[in-house]
């Protein structure tokens, strides 16, 4: 099983890097994990709606260039499907059972994800009704993927 996470922007905070490294290490027991960072666009607070769309489009173009053919594409979006940890585990398991051995998760930049990239997705996932910084989202996703593999394998961790 292969999981790729394509994330817009670099992680700057040490505590996030440490958490991401820890869960990446834990996940290596269950899957081949690759994390790809693509450059984010500078986005001042006072962008017009059109400028925001242009920023998201440029970021999406960078993401699309890194997608591998045949991967199942899961985009993280606030309007995506909301799931419990158990439901996410079953969804992930169903991807692998259906013959999809490579799943790619995309985390957009601070402005979100371009609608064309959303339309390309096989599945859209929301981690919460709350809004998180996109850097923190990477750590939360990794923890939930680790939790999912523990659930799938019937191993202790999930409570």
UniProtKB/Swiss-Prot annotation:
The keyword S-adenosyl-L-methionine applies. SUPFAM superfamilies: alpha/beta knot. It holds the Pfam family SPOUT_MTase. Signal peptide: none annotated. Disulfide bonds: none annotated. One of its GO terms (cellular component) is cytoplasm. S-adenosyl-L-methionine binds at residues 76, 108, 127-132. InterPro entries: Alpha/beta_knot_MTases, RlmH-like, tRNA_m1G_MTases_N. Keywords: Cytoplasm, Methyltransferase, rRNA processing, S-adenosyl-L-methionine, Transferase. This is Ribosomal RNA large subunit methyltransferase H. The gene is rlmH.
């Amino acid at each position: 099983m292969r999981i790729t996470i394509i994330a817009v922007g670099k992680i700057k905070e040490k505590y996030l890097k440490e958490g991401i490294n820890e869960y990446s290490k834990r996940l290596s027991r269950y899957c081949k994990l690759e994390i790809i960072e693509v450059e984010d666009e500078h986005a001042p607070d006072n962008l017009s709606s059109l400028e925001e769309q242009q920023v998201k489009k440029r970021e999406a173009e960078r993401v699309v260039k890194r997608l591998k053919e045949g991967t199942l594409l899961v985009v993280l979006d606030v309007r995506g499907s909301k799931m419990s940890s158990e439901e996410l585990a079953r969804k992930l398991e169903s991807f692998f059972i259906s013959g999809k051995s490579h799943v790619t998760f995309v985390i957009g930049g601070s402005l979100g994800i371009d609608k064309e990239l959303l339309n390309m997705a096989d599945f859209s996932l929301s981690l919460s009704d709350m809004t998180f910084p996109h850097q923190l989202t990477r750590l939360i996703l990794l923890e939930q993927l680790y939790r999912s593999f523990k659930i799938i394998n019937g191993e202790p961790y999930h409570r």
